[in-house]
Amino acid sequence: MKKMKTMTEGVIWKEILFFAIPLILGNLFQQLYNTVDSIIVGNYVGSNALAAVGSSGAIINLLIGFCIGASTGAGVIISQFYGAKNAEGVRKAVHTTMAIALAAGVLLTVIGIAVTPVMLRLMGTPDEVFEQSVVYLQVYFAGSLFSVVYNMSAGILNAVGNSRRSLVYLMIAAISNIFLDLIMVVGLKLGIVGAALATDISQLISCIFIWGFLIRSEEVYKLKIREIRCYDHLLSKIIRIGIPTGIQNIVISLSNLIVQASVNSFGATVMAGFAAYIKIDGFNILPVLSISMAATTFAGQNIGAGKADRVRKGMYISTAMGAGYSVITGIVLLIFAPQVIGVFTTNHKVVEYGVYIMKYFCPFYWMLGILHVLGGTIRGTGKTMQAMIVFLVSLCGFRVMWIAGTMAWAKSLGHVMMCYPTSWLLGMLLMILYVWKGKWMILRTEKI
């Protein structure tokens, strides 16, 4: 085994930045191939197909979000073991994580395919896009095992600070997805089915690459197929830490489903404009989540090493990074809003709605940056329940109440869109208040 290199030493901003950059690039590549997917569908299949893909995203996030959120528990446990230089703990946590990934992936495939028509009906999906949405989602969920296994495997590498390796495999998947889209949608004329198949195959490719690396590795996180099993004491800890984040993701996704249902009530043209914006929004939120993940890993490893002061300094630095990136992204997207929405479709009305929606989001991205990065640090210390409460109150409870009031008393697209920046403001203030009180800095240095 090689010497364990951790984030518990060195210049803080460099450790966080150099860890976050591959994550940011990876997420941008992931968003790139998702965006290209939508561009190809919108231009070669039609605006209804674009609306179908867009409305499907809320359901995908609902189910995948729980699995990815629950993997936070594994990441926190592994990072704390790694920071404490506990090689045996890392080994057992890695194999428990893989067992969870395989079980969750199979379960997600079955549930996803089964609930697709029901969920789309509950969302009020218009008849003209309903059938395409069902087909796209069911084909997508047929390959969801690969997505879950890849993301959990990448989570292992991220927990030990090796974000560069997962970037390489994500780039391979992104390039594969773009070529497969061109072949299946443009060349073979498979339409929306081809787009979903391209995503499934590209996720399988990334899954094969990352598992191959873990199996061949000589590091403490080496994967051995025969050792994949759940260690009961670790399973309970992963669940205790990870389930709150999983619940957080699934409930927030439910609130987004309610927002999507409200958007659906304005018709397919508005749906297409909203779908185009959501793809663009990923270029802000995914890098912010990458910085948040860097903050989680940094906090987890330094909590494991018992370095509280370093955790606090890392929180300030990573929060500044997240807010700064969001400010720049918001300004750029506002300036070029018509051009970026116009990439997805030639329908002028769809472009008009997409630009209109962007004006409600982009000026307030900085609040979302602060909220997520502070939340990432809190989760890294093991306080996932507290972070969950803040996110549920603001991004779910408040958002649902806002939509209920809007649809009852002042039904307009602008009022619906305002639920996002107002909920970000509430969440940011609540998270700052929790951090300011300081109770999260009671070190969790007990053996895990």
Describe the residue ranges of each PLM region.
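Residue-level signal for short hydrophobic patches within transmembrane helices
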Residues: E9, W13-L32, V36, I59-F66, ...
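Transmembrane helical elements of multi-pass membrane transporters/channels
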Residues: F18-D37, V139, Y150, A173, ...
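Short runs within selected transmembrane alpha-helices of multi-pass transporters and secretion channels
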Residues: S71, Y140-N158, S166-A174, A195-I208, ...
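Small-residue-rich hydrophobic transmembrane alpha-helices
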Residues: L50-V110, S147-S166, Q260, G273-A337, ...
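Small-residue hotspots at the loop-to-helix junctions and early N-terminal turns
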Residues: V45-A58, S133-L137, A196, A268-F283, ...
